[in-house]
Amino acid sequence: LNAGSVLIYPEAFSAKERSVYLSGEAVFEVTHNDELPFMVNTSDLTIRVHGTTFNVNAYPESRNTSATLCEGSISATLKNNGESILMIPEERLSYDRETGKSTISRVNPSEDTAWKRGDMCFRSENIHAIVKAIERKYGINTYVTSGKYDDMILTAKFVQGETMEQMLGAICKLVPGMKYSIVNGCVYIR
């Protein structure tokens, strides 16, 4: 279970299914059982597990909800239209909450599960999503005070042991003119 995440599950599963609710991000390793299917529910997706390892990213403040299949198989049902998508390993289903559209892409699952190792991987991510992930990891408030970065897309990898200051410094080196300051425990990016 990643930082800032909540997993809700019953004290005992029903006789028909094993169902949990996730807000945030988690990796699941599930043993297949035809008689007792495992379901992960988010605000946007219901994921039915067919025996597998997969990552779900469903932070409520994020624009996208995603499911990345590491091994095995899952089917994901979009709650907005009922469409069900059967996924194969190394696929990521991304659902855009603003447009209501979903996409499937081929990915390296180890990047999406990097957080389990203490690493952070971002591939073509919006600066606001990257800053929010740093905020969750370090439990601090962050503010991007300039609108000129709203459409900024970056690719970066940070390894376990790098400090928040090292991460922010690296981002500022990637973006000409970007600076950050820490005031009263809050990070301001301008």
Tell what function each PLM region has.
Residues 2-190:
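A residue-level detector for the "anchor" residue at the start of short, highly conserved motifs
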